């Protein structure tokens, strides 16, 4: 059986899409301020903010449980306003062989959106789809928007 999967979710946002893109590209460290219930820390371990190859460490809480993730920024695309993160260590690696998260911001006039895409390979057949993580990412998106609409 194929253990690979893909999950995509798009969220319409009212705030400026460019601001969202800049946060995910250059200012990830601000997310813990914008979504403190979900994200407790974002630390740069290697490289520079906003550059491919940078290593970032996240401390987060999902379903009341404290978790961690060490990510490498795999790709940045200015044209499509997307940032690709490959998770290399942390709690998700107990369930998945590979896990890649792509955050893409679509800025078309007044209609902006954020699209979260997961590409993953489960370690075992009985591992659940990452719906809880996707809902968590949507919550963070809403928290960032609320912060900017204040």
Curated annotation (Swiss-Prot):
CDD domains: Bet_v1-like
Modification N-acetylmethionine, positions: 1
One GO BP annotation of this record: defense response
SMART domains referenced in this protein's UniProt entry, alphabetically: Bet_v_1 (SM01037)
Pfam families from the UniProt entry: Bet_v_1
InterPro entries, alphabetized: Bet_v_I/MLP (IPR000916), MLP-like_ligand-binding (IPR051761), START-like_dom_sf (IPR023393)
UniProt PTM: The N-terminus is blocked.
Superkingdom classification of source: Eukaryota
SUPFAM superfamilies reported in the protein's UniProt record: Bet v1-like
Family, as annotated: Belongs to the MLP family.
Name of protein: Kirola
Species assigned in the record: Actinidia deliciosa (Kiwi)
């Amino acid at each position: 059986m194929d253990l690979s999967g893909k999950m995509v979710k798009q969220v319409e946002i009212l705030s400026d899409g460019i601001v969202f893109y800049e946060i995910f590209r250059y200012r990830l460290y601000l997310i813990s301020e914008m979504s403190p219930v979900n994200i407790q820390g974002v630390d740069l371990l290697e490289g520079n903010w906003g550059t491919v190859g940078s290593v970032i460490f996240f401390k987060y809480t999902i379903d009341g449980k404290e978790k961690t993730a060490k990510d490498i920024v795999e790709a940045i695309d200015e044209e499509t306003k997307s940032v690709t993160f490959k998770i290399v260590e942390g709690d998700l690696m107990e369930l998945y062989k590979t896990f890649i998260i792509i955050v893409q911001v679509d800025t078309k006039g007044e209609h902006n959106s954020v699209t979260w895409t997961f590409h993953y390979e489960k370690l075992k057949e009985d591992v659940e789809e990452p719906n809880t993580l996707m809902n968590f990412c949507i919550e963070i998106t809403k928290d960032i928007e609320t912060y900017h609409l204040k």
